[in-house]
């Protein structure tokens, strides 16, 4: 199965199972350690993840809140950069050729590697999609083509402030899915207005004809269920990372990785069980 096929197949499986929305956890590659990342990814899949978003650690993550920033700092302190992240994806692919992996990060590491070299390396590692937070769609046509030619989906963010013209522009170039940021500000901040999200998704779907995932502000089963009634995917990161962080802090030095992985799997499974009970509000009768 090729990389972009995996994303489409994942959403198709969700639909065929009669589920309202896919579950997409976000973790920072290299946190709590590089050695724990691949086992953690497999644990998330066992817990019910349909896709996995893997954050590429960066020293100046402007869109990330304090929880995700701390995770990136821990990873960077252990020497994890873009090349190591690609190695981790390749390691994951040895045992899982089905679950899509999407890299989420910033332009600087990609620019240092070179856009074309990165696109080719991402495809070789088994990356399915790439979301670059600080690449506006109107400036990355060439890069999006490079990714698409390599079979890697260029994925874009939309926000509450996105104009209809911007939504239309992203609808033309995005592949895989679009990530709607449900709150203004950084990850893990603010409170969720589900009605506002539903209204914005209705506008987005006029111009975007691929799945739309929603993230930011989803911190528990109840908020995940509310979003799943409207979105094609629920993206959840800060609370998951915080859960791992707390479990690792309470464990002995030689048990931090195992404790973090176990806590992540247990917590994410509760979210998956909650999502399995949701019916899409705008689904046909």
Swiss-Prot record:
InterPro entries: Aldolase_TIM, RibuloseP-bd_barrel, Trp_synthase_alpha_AS, Trp_synthase_suA. CDD domains: Tryptophan_synthase_alpha. It is an enzyme of class 4 (lyase). The keyword Zinc-finger does not apply. It catalyses: (1S,2R)-1-C-(indol-3-yl)glycerol 3-phosphate + L-serine = D-glyceraldehyde 3-phosphate + L-tryptophan + H2O. It holds the Pfam family Trp_syntA. One of its GO terms (molecular function) is tryptophan synthase activity. Pathway: Amino-acid biosynthesis; L-tryptophan biosynthesis; L-tryptophan from chorismate: step 5/5. The keyword Calcium does not apply. It comes from the Bacteria. Its EC number is 4.2.1.20. Gene3D superfamilies: Aldolase class I. Keywords: Amino-acid biosynthesis, Aromatic amino acid biosynthesis, Lyase, Tryptophan biosynthesis. Signal peptide: none annotated. The active site is at residues 53, 64. GO terms for cellular component: cytosol. Tetramer of two alpha and two beta chains. Belongs to the TrpA family. This is Tryptophan synthase alpha chain. It comes from Bordetella pertussis (strain Tohama I / ATCC BAA-589 / NCTC 13251). The gene is trpA.
